[in-house]
């Protein structure tokens, strides 16, 4: 069985080269998946400029075989201006997905509350769709 760092390296190289990997084991839990993502962040050396949320609909969750939304980093080198031509690897079947970007004036503090205060909502400086 491959160690997690080896898998992180393979996944990052596949992203760089546009390769599709079929033979890697899936993480055993969401916690293991986030640990793997942290290693990929380390291996990539990329600057993280924000995070995105994926699998927000039940249909996509079923397609990806997950039971809830998840988050992942946005890398600076992979962000593009609105009018940019974006290369697509020919080994993939491209999909289009709407993404919503929210830019905050300042970082929100992490707490265990599931609610967001009116003050925090007012900290939004820009919403881009």
Where do the language-model regions lie?
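Conserved small/polar residues in nucleotide/adenosyl-binding loops
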Residues: 127-129
């Amino acid at each position: 069985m491959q160690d997690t760092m080896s898998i992180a390296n393979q996944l990052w190289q596949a992203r760089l080269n546009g390769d599709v990997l079929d033979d890697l084991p899936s993480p055993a839990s969401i916690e293991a998946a986030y640990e793997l993502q942290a290693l990929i962040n380390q291996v990539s050396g990329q600057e993280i400029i924000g995070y995105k949320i994926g699998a927000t609909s039940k249909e996509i969750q079923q397609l990806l075989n997950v039971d809830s939304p998840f988050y992942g980093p946005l890398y600076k080198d992979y962000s593009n201006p609105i009018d940019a031509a974006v290369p697509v690897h020919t080994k993939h079947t491209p999909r289009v997905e709407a993404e919503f970007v929210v830019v905050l004036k300042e970082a929100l503090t992490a707490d265990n509350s599931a609610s967001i205060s009116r003050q925090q909502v007012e900290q939004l400086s820009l919403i881009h769709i």
